[in-house]
Amino acid sequence: MNIRRALIGMLSAVVAAALLLGVTFLDVNLTSDVEPDLSYRTLDYDVMVLKNGDLKVTQHIDMKLNDRGFDWKQMYQQYTLKANNLTNISDVSVKDVTNNETYVQGRFVNPNDVTDWNAEYAGQWYIADVSVLRDPQPFNPETDGLKADSSSDKTLEIGWNIPETASADSLKFDVSMTMHGVSTAYDDVVSFQWEPFGTTNQIPIGKVAGKVTFPDGVTKKNSWAWLHTLSLIHISE
C-alpha cells in the first residue's frame, strides 16, 4: 500500500513516558532529593516522521556530571531492536555543542583498556551490538538490522567518547539517528508506538520537551495521538 497516503489517512501513537505527538510541545519536570552522578538537565526531542514511516530523531541533551572519584570518558544509550517496532538504526551522528565539535565514527572500546584516552578515542562515537553481555560486536546498519519476520531481538548501544572529565556543570550534545521499522501499515491507517525512554532508564531528567512533525497532508483533523505515562510528573502543552 502507499505509505504516504496511509500516513495522511491517520497516524496514531502510544507513547510511554514523556512525549506528545504533533506539532505542539510537551514539557515534563521531574524532581529528586538525591544528587546523582549523572543527570540530564534537559532532554529535547526533535522528531520527523518520514514519508516511508521511519523516524528521524534528534536529541538535544544538556547533561550534568558530578565528581565520582574517577574521570568520565564514555556516554551511551541502549536500544532494543524488535521485528514489530524497531528493526534498525542508521544515520547516527553526534555533535559536542558545548565545544562545537562534530564527533567521527569509531568503534567500541573499553576505557579501562586505553592508556591515552584523549589522544586515541576522545571525539569518536560508536554503534555496537551488545546483545551478549560483556561481548560487544560491531554493528553495520546496512547488513545487521532485523528482518520483518525475525524472531530474535538485538540490543544496540550508541555511545560517544568525551575527553577525560572529572565533573561538568553542563555539557551539551546533539545525538541524531534514523529509526527504521517503527510503523505498521494497515489497509487504511499507519500507526506507530514510540517510547522515548523506557522503564529501565536510571538517569534522572530535569525537563523533557518533544516536538514531532509529520509529512505534508497530516493535520490535527486526520491524525490521533495518545500519551501514556506512569510517572508522577507535570505535563503542559
Region annotations inferred by a language model:
Residues N2-L232, S236:
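Lumenal/extracellular ectodomains and adaptor appendage modules
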